[in-house]
Amino acid sequence: MKRAAVLGVLMTLVVSGCQAPERPSTMELPAAAVDNAVAKLTGIAEDLMNSSGIPGMAVAVVHEGKTIYAKGFGVKDIREDDTLDNRVNRDTVFQVASLSKSLSASVVARRVGAGSIDWDTPLVSKLPDFALADPAVTAMVTVGDMFAHRSGLPDHAGDLLEDLGYDRGYVLSKLRELPLDGFRTSYAYTNFGLTAAAEAVAAAAGKSWEQLADDVLYEPLGMTSTSSRFTDYENRSNRAVGHLRIDNRYEPRLQRDADPQSPAGGVSSSVADLAHWLTMILAEGGSEALLPAVTPQIVSRRPTEPAMRAGFYGYGFNVGTTSAARTQLSHSGAFELGAAANFVVLPSADVGIVALTNATPSGVPETLTAEFADLVQFGEVREDWRGLYRDAFADLDAPVGSLVGKTPPTSPAPAPPLPELAGTYANDYWGPATVTERDGKLTLSLGPNAEPWPLTHWDGNVFTFGFLSENAPPGTISKASFNGDTLELEYFDAEGKGTFTR
């Protein structure tokens, strides 16, 4: 209650134009806490690089308005020789994945500060064609609701449509077909919900989101290597290539183009650039426009035992409290296809750290920033962050599907005549699925990408297919079950939408 009261007073003073009081006191930091923590960073980073085997990483720290540490480790692309040109440095550009959400919230805060929009602006006032399943929610849902993931949309709504190659407009138009949970009473992480809010902010500005981010955040802060466009990332000469983990080895396999959800996950940047942004967050976090983003707006993680602290989400920021009773702002970014990122800001210590990697997420950036935060606050690492994050990320890249790890039947029932299964099966949400028979084999294709997936007979009218995408890690297997003119696709049955008919 005391913290809430302080923030309430701060907001009142900002609105009235008075000078805000100093932050409330917290437990004193150990002597030379930040300098001592920074002195150990290189050793921590090198140890994590060696133990994880990831190809590359970059780290930066800001304190008292300055960048006091910025360094690269490892290589940008394991296919190339370990030359100076292939080594990661402070200016190497990485994809930052969902760390984009905090950057995008900063863009919105700039527009709120300019008076052109508000966190409480309803989306439909700027996007008249936008809709959700409930007309009442459609009328009320705001920019802030979407940035806090409290609209009621299902977790990661629309992400699988993106994997199939659908563009931003198509995915946003399909959100209205998804069932809603409690409006403003439930938390579910949605990339395309946040993207819809960003589109509303861009519409109010009369320009694309990508240009708006350039104009109000990246250019003013001197973030010359930062962009919300995938083509800019592709064209950087000093660029870290994403590496996918397959059989405990890292290799560049696929590139992740996140343009459809750019405000939520499509930013690319360097730690040198992100240091400018972290410095701004520390300097302007108490401003009227940014404060709502960096303070709790909804409970994102409920305690499972009395001794646990709840987790909160602001607008594009995780907001929590450390065991030293310090407010902590943070966010992670994770692409299965080869990117992992994390930043942590401790406003009361006036310090922030960011770590970027070019590999399938395994908890390395989170471990590094957590150990650094412990060193700053306590002078020592107090928790087994390596074990905690290793366990937390263990299932992140596990294959998906009910048949994963199962052995095909030794005496399966015969399949129906394959030509009888061929055809186009319609689905209002996913679009048509095409089953093609050629030379006694079936393939399935779906979505704009229309990648042909071989169908392998399993048992009777059940076939299987496997594929690799951002949400389908290596080893993923899905059932494809035929029943007359009906085709059921297990992987695409989220929200009960996996039935296709011809």
Located regions from the model:
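Sec-dependent N-terminal signal peptides
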Residues: 2-11
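C-terminal motif of bacterial Sec signal peptides marking the signal peptidase cleavage site
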Residues: 14-17
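Peripheral terminal and inter-domain segments
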Residues: 19, 24, 370-502
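Short, conserved catalytic-motif segment at the N-terminal edge
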Residues: 31-94, 113-118, 133, 168-169, ...
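Short, well-ordered beta-strand elements
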Residues: 68, 341-358, 488-490
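Short, surface-exposed loop or secondary-structure junction motifs
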Residues: 76-77, 134-337, 341-343
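Short, glycine/proline-biased beta-turn/loop segments that scaffold the active-site neighborhood
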Residues: 118-134, 221
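Contiguous hydrophobic, core-forming segments of folded domains
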Residues: 347-385
